[in-house]
Curated annotation (Swiss-Prot):
Protein name stated in the entry: Myelin-oligodendrocyte glycoprotein
GO biological process: one example: cell adhesion
InterPro entries, A to Z: Ig-like_dom, Ig-like_dom_sf, Ig-like_fold, Ig_sub, Ig_V-set, IgSF_BTN/MOG, Myelin-oligodendrocyte_glycop
Subunit-level organization: Homodimer.
Keywords: Cell adhesion, Disulfide bond, Glycoprotein, Immunoglobulin domain, Membrane, Signal, Transmembrane, Transmembrane helix
Pfam families listed in its UniProt record: V-set
PROSITE patterns to which the protein is assigned, alphabetical: IG_LIKE
Family of this protein: Belongs to the immunoglobulin superfamily. BTN/MOG family.
Topology relative to the membrane: Multi-pass membrane protein
Length: 246
């Protein structure tokens, strides 16, 4: 009001200009950090990418950028002084993270987590720090089993398919050999009846068939048993690795 009463318009204009300049300087370093806004989904053993950016966009090459998790603010990945600070990472993330910096000059970065584990599921916090000013954004990672949509009964059936496919041709071979051996044994028995006394052969026909078939099918049955054992063992190891990759 003093300016109005004294009609000192140049001094009023200069005061207003200085005020605007002071306000612009105080807000020059401020920005907002924006996350994806929705849960990021990844399969166990696969890769997950967590995007993060600042608004308004600006060159973040000289800033400190990082991700951490609660509790105890465990460092997932940290970028400072123009390079990654791997030594400050939590042990469970060492060698498994990568900061994609192709668009860091625009204020956009992405954290890539490799070989995702079930323990990686949960909340993450991304932050940008420019000197003493820092802003953060929260995001969530959901980890899913590759076979989460499959009923356990279906998994059991899938595991048994190779065994069934092997046993079908084995059964056909068994029936074929049984038919051939029966015909051959019947002819030999008839010849023996013609040559020797009928009372000489008192051994039942099924026993003769058994004595001939067992030496033929014995190794085949052993092979089937070994295959089933090996298949169950490998299937168990595969499912265990899916649940506990490390």
């Amino acid at each position: 009001m003093a300016c109005l009463w004294s009609f000192s318009w140049p001094s009023c204009f200069l005061s207003l200009l200085l005020l605007l300049l002071q306000l612009s300087c105080s807000y020059a370093g401020q920005f907002r950090v924006i996350g994806p806004g929705y849960p990021i989904r990844a399969l166990v053993g696969d890769e997950a990418e967590l995007p993060c950016r600042i608004s308004p966009g600006k060159n973040a090459t000289g800033m400190e950028v990082g991700w951490y998790r609660s509790p105890f603010s465990r460092v997932v990945h940290l970028y400072r002084n123009g390079k990654d600070q791997d030594a400050e990472q939590a042990p469970e993330y060492r060698g498994r993270t990568e900061l994609l910096k192709e668009t860091i000059s625009e204020g956009k970065v992405t954290l890539r987590i490799q070989n995702v584990r079930f323990s990686d599921e949960g909340g993450y916090t991304c932050f940008f720090r420019d000197h003493s000013y820092q802003e953060e954004a929260a995001m969530e990672l959901k980890v899913e089993d590759p076979f989460y949509w499959v009923n356990p009964g279906v998994l059991t059936l899938i595991a048994l398919v190779p065994t069934i496919l092997l046993q079908v041709p084995v059964g056909l071979v068994f029936l074929f050999l049984q038919h051939r051996l029966r015909g051959k044994l019947r002819a030999e028995v008839e010849n023996l009846h013609r040559t020797f006394d009928p009372h000489f052969l008192r051994v039942p026909c099924w026993k003769i068939t058994l004595f001939v078939i067992v030496p033929v099918l014995g190794p085949l049955v052993a092979l089937i048993i070994c295959y089933n054992w090996l298949h169950r063992r490998l299937a168990g190891q595969f499912l265990e690795e899916l649940r506990n990759p490390f």
